[in-house]
Amino acid sequence: MVSDSLKICTVCAANNNRSMESHKQLKDAGYNVRSFGTGSAVRLPGPSVDKPNVYEFGTPYDDIYRDLTSQEYHKMYESNGLIRMINRNRHIKRAPEKWHNNASAGKFDLVITCEERCFDLVLDDLMVRLVNKDQADTEIKQAVHIINIDIKDDYENAVIGGKGILKLVNMIHEFRNTNKQRRLDHDFDDESDTILEDQMMKLLAKWQQEHTHLPTLYSVAYY
């Protein structure tokens, strides 16, 4: 585990391809990471465009794997990479999880979405949570950085996008460590570890120079 890792979350629609590939890369690098989907259900390619394979969130990847490999179309799923994707997922965590049901996961420092619609849904949900928060709750609001990195939903682009996400998280982590060391060196005890909005925007701008193929959006929300 990376020392002093941010609590990170990756999000796509079905929590199967883009968010899971970036989850894997961040996990392999030692970061504290979870992943979720914003869709109403887990929709995966089927024998035709109008016949997807649909599962409820929480259906174990092992069950999805067994179902797909038992179908008469399993050769198609092998050739289009679907079986490979589910096999990868079941070695990362138990089942796809829905973003809107993740209150028990606690608060994240950084949420990275992989599609603009997911970005909007995450922001909307966090706003609803804040509005519905118990008025008697005096807990200090915690900022969460929401970054969207637009990734095409196929296996190859998910790998490319995952590498880009890992690079960005490495930059953010290095920035935090440098700031922390500076405070220790100069006894700046009154400064917090929180990355400010303008600091994050500068990091994103620097990252974007090397990742022009991955458009980004950025916002800050609160718990």
From Swiss-Prot:
Q: What is its EC number?
A: 3.1.3.16
The intrachain disulfides are none
The molecular function terms of the Gene Ontology recorded here are: protein tyrosine phosphatase activity; RNA polymerase II CTD heptapeptide repeat S5 phosphatase activity
Coiled-coil region(s):
none
Q: Where in or outside the cell?
A: Nucleus
Query: Mind telling me which GO cellular component terms the entry cites?
Result: chromatin; mRNA cleavage and polyadenylation specificity factor complex
Primary location recorded for the protein, binned into one broad class:
nucleus
InterPro entries listed in its UniProt record: RNA_pol_II_suA (IPR006811)
Source taxon at top rank: Eukaryota
UniProt keyword annotations, A-Z: Hydrolase, mRNA processing, Nucleus, Protein phosphatase
Its biological purpose is as follows: Processively dephosphorylates Ser-5 of the heptad repeats YSPTSPS in the C-terminal domain of the largest RNA polymerase II subunit (RPB1).
Quaternary form?
Component of the cleavage and polyadenylation factor (CPF) complex.
Q: Which family does it belong to?
A: Belongs to the SSU72 phosphatase family.
This protein's name: RNA polymerase II subunit A C-terminal domain phosphatase SSU72
**Organism field:** Debaryomyces hansenii (strain ATCC 36239 / CBS 767 / BCRC 21394 / JCM 1990 / NBRC 0083 / IGC 2968)
Lineage of the species this protein comes from: Eukaryota, Fungi, Dikarya, Ascomycota, Saccharomycotina
